[in-house]
Amino acid sequence: MTLQEEIIRQLGVKASIAPQEEIRKTVDFLKAYLRKHSFLKTYVLGISGGQDSTLAGKLAQMAIAELREETSDQAYQFIAVRLPYGVQTDEADAQKALAFIMPDQTLTINIKAAVDGQVEALQAAGVEISDFNKGNIKARQRMISQYAIAGQMAGAVIGTDHAAENITGFFTKFGDGGADILPLFRLNKRQGKALLKVLGADAALYEKVPTADLEDQKPGLADEVALGVTYQDIDDYLEGKLISKVAQATIEKWWHKGQHKRHLPITIFDDFWK
């Protein structure tokens, strides 16, 4: 088995999908998790205005709405959370995503004071924080807020990790990489886009340039620039297609580099890192 085949196997990616079937499968998955854990009544998800959180949010709201109808339990709720650092430059996209999702509840927590306070405390202790490192603090602070909400609201936190993100390790360890449930896992970027099209999302929500937008000194830095490879190449690779040797080498480099992010803390029994 080639490395490409092994990665595809681990991430569960299909070469082609039926969007309606994947929508149904995901909604049922989200419903089943809450039904199994009767002490949970809510899903919590940060909404950025990008493709991934828009899709995960819509599917979560659909699942919650069906659960309420099937059980007559009005305690089931989907809580969308806006988590800007100061003023988000593409706030209009976030509002457009919320209008599409129509969440039961929307909360806004501005993380700037918490992030800046942490950076200042570290600097006071003599630890200088790089802009890149500060970006990771932002991602982790967003998850702190979401788990605080989930803890108060009998909730589970939804993550937006998908195959095209997982393969490159393009997420913050214990930040956006930390969640209770990953409804998009197995889908690549173009497949997620296909689901949003079927769901009737505004094209602007899935055609916009993907960005983590975590670094102050590189605002709106495109994922593809940061990674050095296009999502088209990543998606093609995940679908078992041939791509250029340069693109393949870049993708596989990121796969190996991000391996530690796909595991729980390493124990003496682990050998994947050797």
Swiss-Prot record:
InterPro entries: NAD/GMP_synthase, NAD_synthase, NH(3)-dep_NAD(+)_synth, Rossmann-like_a/b/a_fold. ATP binds at G46, I47, S48, G49, G50, Q51, D52, S53, T160, K189, T211. Pathway: Cofactor biosynthesis; NAD(+) biosynthesis; NAD(+) from deamido-NAD(+) (ammonia route): step 1/1. Mg(2+) binds at D52, E165. Deamido-NAD(+) binds at R140, K173, D180, H260, K261. One of its GO terms (cellular component) is cytoplasm. GO terms for molecular function: ATP binding; glutaminase activity; metal ion binding; NAD+ synthase (glutamine-hydrolyzing) activity; NAD+ synthase activity. Coiled coil: none annotated. It catalyses: deamido-NAD(+) + NH4(+) + ATP = AMP + diphosphate + NAD(+) + H(+). Its EC number is 6.3.1.5. Keywords: ATP-binding, Ligase, Magnesium, Metal-binding, NAD, Nucleotide-binding. GO terms for biological process: NAD biosynthetic process. It is an enzyme of class 6 (ligase). Homodimer. Catalyzes the ATP-dependent amidation of deamido-NAD to form NAD. Uses ammonia as a nitrogen source. PANTHER family: NH 3 /GLUTAMINE-DEPENDENT NAD + SYNTHETASE, NH(3)-DEPENDENT NAD(+) SYNTHETASE. Belongs to the NAD synthetase family. This is NH(3)-dependent NAD(+) synthetase. It comes from Streptococcus pyogenes serotype M3 (strain ATCC BAA-595 / MGAS315). The lineage of its organism: Bacteria, Bacillati, Bacillota, Bacilli, Lactobacillales.
